[in-house]
């Protein structure tokens, strides 16, 4: 077929074929770059959401410790606890504002908000062990929600190994390591206030620290 064509027609046909190949390659490159851009944009959005969640978690852990002190009789901690309660409430609102509409409507986040509302309104009427337990359950739910945020924003799907390990440490390993220390601090605050410790409390502390 090519032999029957004039040179001008051959050049036009080859040029058209070459143009098609170039267009296909350009489309492939553009698609890959678009995916990278969208992935990067999602990751940046995830980091912007995780920052206030981390701050909220720390405030909740501190509120747990102060609550343990107050419920065990430390009157000097009442004002600090009240101030920390306002800080946590503001942090919860900041996280809610930072979340995407999809994440904001997730049952996991709504459960965290309900947990906090219950603690803020009823926490001082509970026994010290119950208060500690409810705080710890709430914080555990927050830590699990952090993983959900990371998954939804592709932070835990990063193909670059170094970045993946960094995100895994930030989202999973470090919070899992720090939370037992927070529980120990809360228990310790209560014990120091009461100035007494039972055998079961010794066992509980040992199990957390082991």
Locations of the language-model features?
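Hydrophobic alpha-helical segments
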Residues: 1-210
């Amino acid at each position: 077929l090519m032999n029957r064509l004039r040179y001008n027609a051959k050049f036009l046909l080859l040029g058209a074929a070459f143009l098609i190949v170039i267009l296909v390659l350009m489309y492939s490159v553009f698609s890959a770059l678009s995916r990278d851009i969208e992935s990067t944009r999602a990751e940046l959005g995830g980091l912007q959401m995780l920052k206030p969640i981390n701050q909220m978690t720390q405030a909740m852990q501190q509120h747990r410790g102060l609550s343990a002190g107050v419920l065990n009789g430390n009157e000097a901690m009442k004002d600090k606890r009240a101030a920390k309660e306002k800080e946590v409430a503001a942090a919860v609102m900041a996280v809610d504002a930072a979340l995407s509409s999809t994440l904001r409507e997730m049952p996991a986040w709504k459960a965290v908000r309900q947990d906090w509302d219950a603690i803020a309104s009823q926490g001082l009427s509970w026994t010290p062990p119950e208060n500690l337990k409810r705080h710890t359950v709430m914080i555990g739910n927050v830590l699990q929600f952090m993983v959900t945020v990371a998954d939804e924003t592709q932070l835990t799907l990063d193909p670059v190994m170094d970045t993946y390990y960094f995100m895994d440490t930030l989202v999973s390993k470090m919070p899992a390591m720090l939370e037992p220390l927070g529980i120990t601090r809360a228990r310790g605050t209560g014990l120091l206030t009461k100035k007494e410790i039972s055998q079961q409390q010794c066992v509980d502390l040992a199990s957390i620290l082991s």
